[in-house]
Amino acid sequence: MQPAVSLIAGAVLSALLCSSAIAAETSANADGLTDRAARGNLVEPGGARRLAGDQTTALKASLSDKTAKNVILLIGDGMGDSEITAARNYAEGAGGYFKGIDALPLTGQYTHYSLDRKTHKPDYVTDSAASATAWATGVKTYNGALGVDVNGKDQPTLLEIAKAAGKATGNVSTAELQDATPAALVSHVISRKCYGPEETSEKCAANALENGGRGSITEQLLKTRADVTLGGGAKSFNQLAKSGEWQGKSLKDQAAAQGYQWVSNADELQAVTLANQQKPLLGLFADGNMPVRWLGPKASYHGNLDKPAVTCENNPARTAATPTLAAMTEKAIALLKDNPNGFFLQVEGASIDKQDHAANPCGQIGETVDLDEAVQKALAFARADGNTLVIVTADHAHASQIVSADAKAPGLTQKLTTKDGAPMTLSYGNSEEESQGHTGTQLRVAAYGPHAANVVGLTDQTDLFFTMRDAMGIK
């Protein structure tokens, strides 16, 4: 019997050692999927390589088609490939990488055109309203529309569908909560400009409560009743309802009467311990958009030639009382995960776009860094949870381009000193107006978790709706 026992013990030990070796190899390969820093000295052969080795096994191991209990969608508004690259160069260096944005293992590109309202033909440069409606509803629409198709017909949003399925829902943005990206999840209006009752009566009369419509974006936000809603836009809640049971009362008073928890600074946000349909959380941390992370000079004509390279500075207006996007994301996840049915959460870094419009490199770069930190929070939760799909993408591409440091560009330029100590010039040149414009270049979309493979290759922005809905197994 002793030899047999020895053989069995040896076989078990061999299996354990083999299992450990496979686990170690898988772990190392998994690390190779997330750590994308250059591996050595950039001047040496292979020094700029980002791959540690073959990643086939690790990619196979990352694939899963099980139902996702939770979905977290993170949007960089205006975050095209140029914006990602510029921010990475500045903050991490040419051989560095973002530990959130660059750490998702499965990556693709998607198209994001909208439709012309009259001809129904493609409009190759979308706005944030049409693009957010595309992933929120799976339907193409015209620029400016929120939650409606090209004919103005209401379309159910993913947040509404997830809520009806019993999931917790969250909506987080650094913009006004009435702005296009957050508004597309919770409202159905023919124009994105209809923030409150006053604008709606003037610009979206058919949507106004007094005309039998659903009401303004802010009124619909309250009625949709996500469990967690965080961002800016407090001033619109001061408007008075013009019709219905709340006529003559402010929307802030209406929120209180409907049981919302209202918080306005970082300490109050952290003190919240519960958010659900009985006590939904409404965090409003600015009258308008929330303050950006970094400040610096705007680009100007031949600014890279006439002015010295700059280093971005912290924005003194963003005090400790203002929660960061990462802090809002982390808190939203902590509150939403208590729902046994899971949750759907959208997070937007809004001012990449707004600072790109303003030709402000430091503002734009700082907001991209902010989004990356939020992505890191989402990924940390998803890795620990094992049942969460995380997707990172943008709504449209934008104006900024990286050009030669001393280029004589026809547009507006500014030179910055990157983490490498090297000069980098950003150029903005697609508009003679005060505001730079969007562009129609396809966008990066990356994912981690169950059903992440569905972002690989070329997809369309509307595919994102079906990918997220089907991953959660809801209809």
Swiss-Prot record:
Zn(2+) 2 binds at residues 77, 395-396. Its main location: periplasm. It is found in: Periplasm. PROSITE patterns: ALKALINE_PHOSPHATASE. Disulfide bonds join 194-204, 312-362. Residues 419-439 are annotated as: Disordered. Residues 1-23 form the signal peptide. Mg(2+) binds at residues 77, 179, 181, 346. Zn(2+) 1 binds at residues 353, 357, 438. Its EC number is 3.1.3.1. The keyword Disulfide bond applies. Its cofactor is Mg(2+); Zn(2+). It comes from the Bacteria. The keyword Phosphoprotein applies. GO terms for molecular function: alkaline phosphatase activity; metal ion binding. This is Alkaline phosphatase. It comes from Serratia marcescens. The gene is phoA.
